[in-house]
Amino acid sequence: MRGGTDPRFRVRPTLEVLELIHQCKILPLDDVLALQDAYIFLRRLEHRIQVWDDQQTHYLPDDQEVRARLAQSMFGENAEVQTFLEELDRHQNKVAQLFGQAFQLDGESRLDLTPLAHDWKPDATHFPESLVRWQAWLGGSKQKQLPEKSRLIFDNLMRQAAERLEADGTPQLSADQALLRFFDLLEAIARRSAYLSILAEYPKALANVLELLKASQWGAQYLTRHPHLLDHLLNSRTEKTLIERPQEYWLEVKASLNMRLDDVMADGDGSEQAMDILRVTHHTETFITLLADLGIGVDSPLPLEKVSDHLSALADLILQTTFERVWPGIAQKFEFSKDLTPPFAIISYGKLGGKELGYASDLDLVFLYESDENDYAAQEIYALLAKRMINWLTAFTSTGSLFEIDTRLR
């Protein structure tokens, strides 16, 4: 799941991936160690089974004599079969337990994918506008172009969303608006089966999506534009460090971001991939802040000033990182040492300058440099640096853009 946006996870060795999971604090250390132990045990057992049968098999033999020899091979000549089987069960059960916990299924059933009743439709009293939208969807070209399974998921997600919104006491107007927003989201992801599957297979994700859609039109539009963020609704618990120790949190985000940027920029320019990584990081952290703002995954919603603090800290991080990644290219062009710290400053005005940034705020920036009176190349150098930074921050890539930048002094 994370390999789609984080290139560090696109490696084959399982133990290397588990170490990355530990470094990124995706799982607690005890769980990572348990998975490492299980992997080593199961891999050793796999090798012994395959050597015994001389074929690529992963089935434990039923023959008790073979099992006894496997136990001795794993634990020594005095090992008992029962001890071997108990150890095997322990590792298998632990892996299954951690896998189940990873998605917080909480015993809820997955989406029913049976065809809807022919006459099913959103209740006209509760969802008048959604009903009109649904009737226009039925038999339309977009619906007909979907694969059968995707169409079944789409239809049943609409049915379940309508039932949940009607049953949870959401006021009629808010419920209708939320269902319309859900329709927008489903249309945006309808041809991307992985995203549909998240909502179909993990009821907690669907519940969190509906909470978001009810609470925020901007959040609904943001998720629809960036559906990869659905991953963050599988488990709604917001990282506590963000709220309790924000400075530590942003240092961790910066370290993770730099590792990813190093991977794509180590062997060449890699600026296009780097720009995408910056955008995905910004989308992710903005969305995590939004969830905390709305009270999704936290004990109580973030106060408004804390939301502004987080968004401003994120913008500062993106600006600093952009400068750090653009400057080496400028230094190389003008034959400076890339380790030279240039006499260059980014001054923030407006919302960011006052640490009052909102979700859709633009950035009011002024770029300043210092040079000797006779340094005639300085203007060219630092104008190019500012121009490239603005391009990194404002250009539209496959993952969108970062900010609108205003450099006019008023």
Model-predicted segments: where are they?
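Non-catalytic regulatory/linker segments of enzymes
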Residues: 1-410
